[in-house]
Amino acid sequence: MSENIVSVNNLSVSFDYQENFLSKKQKIKAVNNINIKIKKGSFFGLVGESGSGKTTLGRAILGANKISTGNVIFHDEERDFDLTTITPKEKKEYRKKAQLIFQDPYAALSPRMTVRDIIAEPLEVMKITKSREETDARVRDIASKCRLNLEHLRRFPHAFSGGQRQRISIARALVSNPKFIVADESVAALDVSIQADILNLLKQLQHELNLTYLFISHDLSVVAHVCDIVAVMYLGHIVEMAPSRELFRNPRHPYTKALLSSIPSIDPEKKSEAIELKGEIPVQ
């Protein structure tokens, strides 16, 4: 049995680009020749500036973006799923095992549905439960794990704060009992005072439910707080990957050093200047 839950091998994702309707279509590589292994039970961080390809990579691993070259293998306890050759029937099974936590808790929840119906929807769509009683029991169980009260299940999303809405989003992602979670900027839209609460909840759920995370973020201080291993993306490439403490203590790539230099310090005596990257942007 593999110790990895996800293996990404020589993965590239391209999109068609056309300046105007008269110009010729071109291919732009959003993700270029990525190789990573995500170990079971790990909190794997993926960082980089906007446009570096983080979200595209995460969506490709979930099967939401079409893979141009390479492959993604999801190692389940019973079998492996190859996302380049996966059938529609297998994809339905895979979606029970790999889920996404969205960035914006305000846009991710339907204002016309109660919290109970929002959390229960994956169970009904995937036909995981066989009766309303079983569905309600599953919803109540995961809601309590995500620190939601039973009275919350009867309310609509507008009645909740940003942190509470994100807990609802987390409960919806976990109700199908997945083993792998892609958290795409899952605390970026929240106040700093709420971020720590959500991050601690994710860590707690990781231990309780034996979860593996791919945590996508541009906030290095957040990644340092929760991640075991960190990969740095730049222009669709992984430029550096190392255990979290090692990467923050001894960065090797110039881009990683530039990212770390941009983190503000709370020490008024410490003076640090952001490193400016020089030269031309590499051609992909």
Language model: regions and residue ranges:
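The feature captures the beta-strand-to-loop junction immediately N-terminal to the Walker
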Residues: 47-49
